[in-house]
Amino acid sequence: MAPTLPVVSSYTSSPTSLVTLVIGVTTLVWFLSTLHRAVTSPLRSLPGPLWSHFTHLPLKLAIVRGRRTQYIHALHQRHGAVFRLTPTEVAIADAAAAKQIHKPGGGYDKAAWYAQFVQGNAAGLFDMSDAKMHAARRRLFARAFGKSEIRGRWEWMVREKVELAVRRVGEELRRGEESDLLKWWTFMATDKNEYIHVLESTMIGSGIRSELPLLATLGRLIPHPTLQAMFNANSRLLDYGTRAVASSKAAGTGGQGASIFAQLDPDEQKASAFPLTDLDIRVEAGNFIVAGADTTAVSLTYLTYAVLAHPPLQAQLEAEVARLPPAFADRDCEACPLLTAVVNETLRLYGAAPGSLPRAVPSGGAELGGWWLPEGTTV
């Protein structure tokens, strides 16, 4: 009689047991690979919190809560100018290193983090990591964003919106009411109230999507209006971009208020190695909405706060602008030294969108802040 072989069906006959086995093996492999990375990583000797050797999760949670800047600042106070933030990212608060990282042509391309913001398979200026493509795109927009072009085509509209916002603030104050300056500056910087809701949803949804993509994917599947608005806001921005394409084609290239996209030089478009497609214009239009609305409102709110918090400065500033001619223009304001200084100092102290600008260490590695970092490290 042949010998009886051991029966091993206890794990194969039960689906529950098989799932448990797979989960257990997967967890063990993840744990061992994480431990191996922590022990062998070239970044292991850098200062930093213990968890930075193993996981990104504490940083991701801080970002989702809108506390990234404060969170990293607190860690700098504890660990110094250079420390390991995650298994693959190093935080640096060093002027010389910052200059090296962000100087033009320095070789530090945008980190992979930016790729998560690409819409419709078309990268815009904000999330474009290819340096040559980015430079070509900037050249296409250079004329439209030149100071003389903006003044000639848009100053009248800016003045109308500024005067309307200031008038509304004055009406509230004369009625003895408090005035929400952030609200009015946001209305001033945004064409339609609908845009504001899209901007708010985009900011929240983009943060979650970039740090916790699985949660964002699940959120899009839940048929709740708030979640749908939050996690599909980019699609709505693309819709606005579509309107920009249509209006730019209809408006032509002349006259005040012509679309930024209508001012693109056709010859430059043809000569460019990376000409703009309709999808590119839709994406850039959405980017411009995000970049120019709440940033303007936030900066003006902090400027107003800072001036009111310093009465002597307020008096000097009021005296300076009182000397402007009745029909003053932007050029006249630019010639006011104190006003210019106040604007610049506000932008220095209260950046409209403070946060990291993650870059990847170039091929061959680099020394930053006294530490050698391997290529591909996010800094």
Where are the language model's segments positioned?
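Conserved, non-catalytic sequence blocks in retroelement Pol enzymes and Pol-derived host proteins
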Residues: L43-P47, L61-G66, S148-R153, D330-P337
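Cytochrome P450 C-terminal heme-thiolate binding region
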Residues: T86-A98, L238-A250, R323-V379
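Structural signal for hydrophobic/aromatic residues that build the beta-strand cores
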Residues: G48, L75, L85, D94, ...
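Cytochrome P450 heme-thiolate monooxygenase catalytic core
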Residues: K110-Q119, M133, G152-L300
